[in-house]
Amino acid sequence: MINIRKTHPLMKIINNSFIDLPAPSNISSWWNFGSLLGICLILQILTGLFLAMHYTSDTMTAFSSVTHICRDVNYGWLIRYLHANGASMFFICLFLHVGRGMYYGSYMFMETWNIGVLLLFAVMATAFMGYVLPWGQMSFWGATVITNLLSAIPYIGTDLVEWIWGGFSVDKATLTRFFAFHFILPFIVAALAGVHLLFLHETGSNNPSGLTSDSDKIPFHPYYTIKDILGALVLILALSTLVLFSPDLLGDPDNYIPANPLNTPPHIKPEWYFLFAYAILRSIPNKLGGVLALVLSILVLALMPVLHTSKQRSMMFRPISQCLFWLLVADLLTLTWIGGQPVEHPFIIIGQLASILYFSLILVLMPLASLLENNLLKW
């Protein structure tokens, strides 16, 4: 009998992606984050869909509609907090996924990596626009500050900002279009994730050693399906704990104050997952320079394959590069902390030093360390 799993046009795609896929036998739990990101995306789309059924994208009623969801809709509070904290879990998984790619040299799969960078930008744009929707103080002022950065673009800047706003300030038109974009972008992200997987399956997965694993492959199912289910359970446990015990832990209390264009909050700051980029933006006194640094802080990831000077793919056997990688992690944590602090001494200088170190590590120190390691191994 012919197996329908292997012959049916649709089943065949699923089979070749999740069942009979040959996978390296030694991939660690760091390879779980791809599937976890898929789960996060599905969760966000589902909770977002149910929120959109009750939300109104009008400046007069947006804040009230979110309150209505939390108070009057059956389990509305749960859906709302799953969506808000689901975004945080999404970014935790994203950062770990990208970090894994940097550590083990997964960026050598050029197409997969570049689509991944594009995905990162798309998810960041989605999260930013989603943060504007509750129309609290931080929503309004965050939208004002971040969209205003585009005015730094020479010649067309001011026109561009007013075009995005749909007027001369962040108002009803802005909120409505942000809701429309926030609704459509996750589906674009899902499509890009499909392309991301398509390119990954052209080459097969990397593995911790960075060596080719063609001689030692195992089927994805049952080995990695069960491993992914364990990862999913840990993710769901962490998210449930966050949502049910401290749902506002990662949020800003200012967002419980309805948006008021006449009253600026003392400290305007984005959600925690943007703080590292926000710190880099603020560390440069020039507006255009800051915007360029902000974009480059993510875009620099696209240069990783070009900056790879080592003769080994993975950092598994490269202790100097390992030290610099963990220094980069510590630096990003420092930038995240600085991004949430007021613009005053000593935070300004710490932020500037951390920003310089961030770019120096990726663009200069890590490639040099790789060359040094090549020489030490007499390669």
Curated annotation (Swiss-Prot):
Its cofactor is heme b. A ubiquinone binds at H201. It is found in: Mitochondrion inner membrane. Heme b b562 binds at H83, H182. Keywords: Electron transport, Heme, Iron, Membrane, Metal-binding, Mitochondrion, Mitochondrion inner membrane, Respiratory chain, Transmembrane, Transmembrane helix, Transport, Ubiquinone. One of its GO terms (molecular function) is ubiquinol-cytochrome-c reductase activity. Pfam families: Cytochrom_B_C, Cytochrome_B. It comes from the Eukaryota. It is a multi-pass membrane protein. The chain crosses the membrane at residues 33-53, 77-98, 113-133, 178-198, 226-246, 288-308, 320-340, 347-367. The cytochrome bc1 complex contains 11 subunits: 3 respiratory subunits (MT-CYB, CYC1 and UQCRFS1), 2 core proteins (UQCRC1 and UQCRC2) and 6 low-molecular weight proteins (UQCRH/QCR6, UQCRB/QCR7, UQCRQ/QCR8, UQCR10/QCR9, UQCR11/QCR10 and a cleavage product of UQCRFS1). This cytochrome bc1 complex then forms a dimer. Heme 1 (or BL or b562) is low-potential and absorbs at about 562 nm, and heme 2 (or BH or b566) is high-potential and absorbs at about 566 nm. Component of the ubiquinol-cytochrome c reductase complex (complex III or cytochrome b-c1 complex) that is part of the mitochondrial respiratory chain. The b-c1 complex mediates electron transfer from ubiquinol to cytochrome c. Contributes to the generation of a proton gradient across the mitochondrial membrane that is then used for ATP synthesis. This is Cytochrome b. It comes from Scaptonyx fusicauda.
